[in-house]
Amino acid sequence: MNIQEPAREIRVIHETEVLVVGSGPGGLAAALGASRAGSQVTLLERFGCFGGNITAVGVEGFAWYRHEHTVDTEGVGIEFETRARDMGAAVKEPQSDSHAIDGEAFKWVADTLVEEAGITPMLHRLFVAPIMEGDTIKGVIVESKAGREAILAERIIDATGDADVAHRAGAITLKQAKEDMIGASVMFSMSGVNKTRFIEHVKSDPQTYRDWAYGQWTVETTGKEDEMFSPFLRKPFEKAREAGLIPEHLDTIAGTWGALYDSGDLTYLNLVHLLGYDGTDPDDLTRGEMEGRKQAMLAIEALKQCTPGCENAKLRNFGMTLGIRDTRKIDAAYNMTEADVRDQGRFEDSIGIFPEFIDGYGILILPTTGRYFQVPYRTLLPKGVKHLICAGRITGGDRVSHAATRNMMCCTVTGQGAGVAAALAAQQKRGFDELDMDDVQAELKRQDVRLQ
């Protein structure tokens, strides 16, 4: 059954040069890139904080791929990490040459970055529809406690993580069957852990990336990762299944821990993996949130009974929302390929680099040899909609390239590139496909982005 919604007038509450929809690593980087390129920028976010996966989900391992010989990206993404460290919102990450970002404290870091840049913040507003003139996007409709409102913009950046703007505006988007998507996760943290006893146990039985292959999982590596330390937890859950604490079929409960503080807080527990859930289906999201929390509590009980140092541990917090890794992607002017990310792809329209880090679909490759690929501008450009550009994990590419470009630091590369392009397109009154790449790359270099 359907109903007919009556036509109504919607108040225009704001006009801006560049509107960024979504404020995860890609959207926040896009807003900063556009602002630093001289444009008036508005950052729209459905939750009450900026930061996306870092803050709303609790993914604190921002650059856990980084090791001694990694050739890393440069630009706003590195700034997120250094500002968090300098503001007391990051600690040394246990498996890499990077910092784990405190997801709660980064809310304040993100606020600070937005305020310093003069960006107009709009929290607690949900994008619901594009405003179109033919095939040109002119703004968006949002819903909030204030009702239905309109925001107009000269250029719009889709950083929603699910290509919501592009999809509803009529751009071509692609989505795998949910059975083939990378699993979703409920992140959580514990308190009451005895740090000394826990670390002694970890050192007595160190785990490596080879141990990631278990149960329903198969993992492809290059071999060089197999002996490297990983803060991986599997054995407590095997013991718990044998003891009847965890149902036998839940052999997907396993994974990594993030930071362990002197206070006894053990954060960024990435132990719950939900397969067959579509992050664009609210019913799947509902089931995933509830099932994920149930599995997290089983995991905590298993750790309490089977891991030294966790005997008195308890739940500290869940992430605010389910962690989604894989939904819609745009069919872009250029779709990145497995060969691009595995074989050091090079592009004349590079907007930044990202190390050879592939994590997803049963593949784990860490960038320990100095190999990296360039990210092409064309992968940000959707087909079928003018004045719209995309950033984050929705950019164009195949499965294996997605396992690289979906990672948060790479999302900052596409975000900063999209932000600079949006600013220049608005200032020059040009389409995104009409920009001079020399101009885009010159501004990115001015913003300390490494292109080659």
Which residues are covered by each model-predicted region?
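Aromatic/His-enriched, Gly/Pro-containing loop or helix-boundary segments
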Residues: R125-R155
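Basic/polar N-terminal segments that are highly enriched at the extreme N-terminus
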Residues: M1-R11, Q452
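Conserved N-terminal/central alpha/beta ligand/cofactor-binding core
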Residues: A7, I13-E15, G33, S39-Q40, ...
